[in-house]
């Protein structure tokens, strides 16, 4: 029987020079690795695009300054220099940011290089927010036109921006007549707000966990919430004044009550809607009742809890302003009532400006805490 000859496999073709991963003698070290990983691209040296929109705040400030200086006023008020100086500052800062807008892309700040990081973030914010800043300046210009230049609204009730900004400067330390200034009122409101907010938040989270986890607590707690929760906290001012002889304690109780209901409802909803699979796995691994509550139910309910905290914070702002008008001797709400009683509406608008910045800052801080705690959550509202 003839022997069967097995065909020998053909030899692989010779690798071309430079095609394999091994570096040739003429190839510098690291060149082969760079070819093997083409996704690693060299740093681009192309200059950042120059945005003409960065000049928008400067153009708007120049237009507002021209209107304020050259359009004749229909109202007789004492001229001030605060408003023109603010416009000049915005104009100069806008020009500087617009001319140096390419620097923030070239900067490579590190955590240890705080000045470079701060300058880069400031330039980036100034360029990206230029249209919004320009719109704000144009609103000031329209306000100046409607109040002082065209007199479309009565002056005592709607002062111009120059009067309001002058009041902010003059009343920051003292409001006159021996009354506290805006800074002292802001600190007093902050203490009052945080006291009531923390008490209401802690009670709301505790009640929400108890009612949501234990059926017996749910049986008795839900009817109480249905009766007390929908009642506005400001409607209970007479009752709070009878219960607490101290007006400050009365205001703290009202703020805590306004925060308690939304925090309790959202915490209750979050605890009751925890996935059963989470609890089953924890029980299988030997988890006890305390572990299920504090390590499974509450962490899973954190998104709902933060929604309740945001709703409670908005309710606390309203309740604080109303409660400060009843017996409290300092605070932004008290300052507005005091200025309105003297028909000094420049002080009223100045306090409103402080309230906008004050409440927005507190809300921003709460959003930062939410983003830090719920870092795993995607698609949430950014502030």
Stretches with model-predicted labels:
Residues 220, 262-309, 332, 336:
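Short cytoplasmic-facing helical segments at TM-TM junctions of multi-pass membrane proteins
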Residues 71-82, 119-121, 125, 149-198:
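Periplasmic/extracellular loop-to-transmembrane helix junction in inner-membrane transport proteins
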Residues 225-260, 269-270:
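Generic hydrophobic transmembrane alpha-helix motif, especially the helices
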Residues 195-225:
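Transmembrane-helix boundary motif in ABC transporter permease subunits
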Residues 96-108, 272, 307, 349-383:
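C-terminal transmembrane helix and the adjacent membrane-cytosol boundary/short C-terminal tail
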Residues 242, 270-271, 318-358, 374-383:
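Glycine-rich helix-loop "coupling/hinge" segments at transmembrane-helix boundaries
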Residues 1, 36-122, 130, 253, 257, 290-323, 350, ...:
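Transmembrane alpha-helices
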